[in-house]
Amino acid sequence: MAIRSIRKYGDELLRKKSRKVEKIDKRLLTLIDDMFETMYNADGVGLAAPQVGILKRLVVIDVGEGPVVLINPEILETSGKAVDVEGCLSIPERQGEVERPTYVKAKALNEKGEEIVIEAEDLFARAICHETDHLNGVLFVDKLAESEGN
C-alpha cells in the first residue's frame, strides 16, 4: 500500500469525466488499497479515483461505519434535502454549505465484482453524492448553497 498524492483544485484532471471500470484486476485492487490509505492519512471520509490522478469510476468511503468500495456507482434514488458544511481533500483550504439529499439509494460493484445496492442516509448519503460528483468532474464548490455565493 502507498499514500498517493492528492490532486488539488485547479488541476484540469479534476474537471474531467471518469471512464467506467471494465475489469477488476490486481492493479485496481492495489489502487483501492492505496486510496484508502491516502484517505485515512488525510483524515478524509471519501476519495474518488480522479483525486489521485486516475480517471476511473471508483470511490472509497468510510464515514465511521467501515470501509466501502463503489466501482461504477450509480445513484438510483434520492429523497430529502439538507444543507451542511462540506470540505474536500482536493480543496483543503475551503469549506462551504452544500445542499444534498438526506437519503440515497445507489448501486455499484464491490471489489469482488459483485453488484451491491446501498441505502445511505445523512453523512453517508452526502459522501456518496460528493464522491460521485468527482467522477463527473463536479466539485463541491460548484454546488455551494445560495447563501455562500460562488
Curated annotation (Swiss-Prot):
SUPFAM superfamilies: Peptide deformylase
Bound cofactor: record note: Binds 1 Fe(2+) ion.
InterPro entries, per the entry: Peptide_deformylase, Peptide_deformylase_sf
Domain of life of the source: Bacteria
Enzymatic class: hydrolase
Catalytic activity: N-terminal N-formyl-L-methionyl-[peptide] + H2O = N-terminal L-methionyl-[peptide] + formate
Active site, UniProt feature: E131
Keywords: Hydrolase, Iron, Metal-binding, Protein biosynthesis
CDD domains in the cross-refs: Pep_deformylase
EC number(s) stated in the UniProt entry for this protein: 3.5.1.88
One of the protein's GO biological processes: co-translational protein modification
Gene3D superfamilies (UniProt xref): Peptide deformylase (3.90.45.10)
One GO MF term attached to the UniProt entry: peptide deformylase activity
Residues bound to Fe cation: C88, H130, H134
Keyword Hydrolase among UniProt keywords: yes
Cofactor(s), by name: Fe(2+)
Listed Pfam families: Pep_deformylase (PF01327)
NCBIfam families in alphabetical order: pept_deformyl, PRK00150.1-3
Role summary: Removes the formyl group from the N-terminal Met of newly synthesized proteins. Requires at least a dipeptide for an efficient rate of reaction. N-terminal L-methionine is a prerequisite for activity but the enzyme has broad specificity at other positions.
Family recorded in the similarity comment: Belongs to the polypeptide deformylase family.
Protein name per Swiss-Prot or TrEMBL: Peptide deformylase 1
Annotated source species: Clostridium acetobutylicum (strain ATCC 824 / DSM 792 / JCM 1419 / IAM 19013 / LMG 5710 / NBRC 13948 / NRRL B-527 / VKM B-1787 / 2291 / W)
Gene it is expressed from: def1
